[in-house]
Amino acid sequence: SMGRGLVRDDVSAILFDEPLTVIDPHLKWKLRRKLKQIHEQFNLTMVYVTHDQLEASTFADKIAVMYGGQIVQFGTPRELFESPNHTFVGFFIGSPDMNLIEVDRADGGVSFDGIHLPLSDTLTRFLSDHPSDNIKVGIRPEFVHVWDEASEEALQCDVTACEDLGT
């Protein structure tokens, strides 16, 4: 389909449906880079369907994340990573996935397991405008820091597991 799309004048978009699924990792990396070069050279819209979030994040200018047959968020890879607006997006984008903690409303914030987590004025207003009791806080593991001493700006907790990622 890509060849026909490149030689015809009446094509404005090319659809790729899992094009790199059964290709070995090294060749996949080379082909992904080549597709990106072709995209930039010909300035065609490419719709790239994949279940591989790394592939989507490195290839795409914008990503549409689907869940249950519906698009639940559309944005840049950075927007999806930093500000997921659906729990599936938080789970799907990033590795390891986002930790989701069910919380309860509390004055000026939320609470869980006896811990009060203050929220910004913007988030507090957002919660007051949305009466749902289904509230979750998402924490990306790479943004967690371990400190030797207690701090008012940190949450005290017990580390129960640590995964060595080799870095």
For each feature predicted by the language model, list its residue ranges.
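ABC transporter nucleotide-binding domain
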Residues: 77-108
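Non-catalytic connector elements of ABC transporters
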Residues: 98-100, 107-167
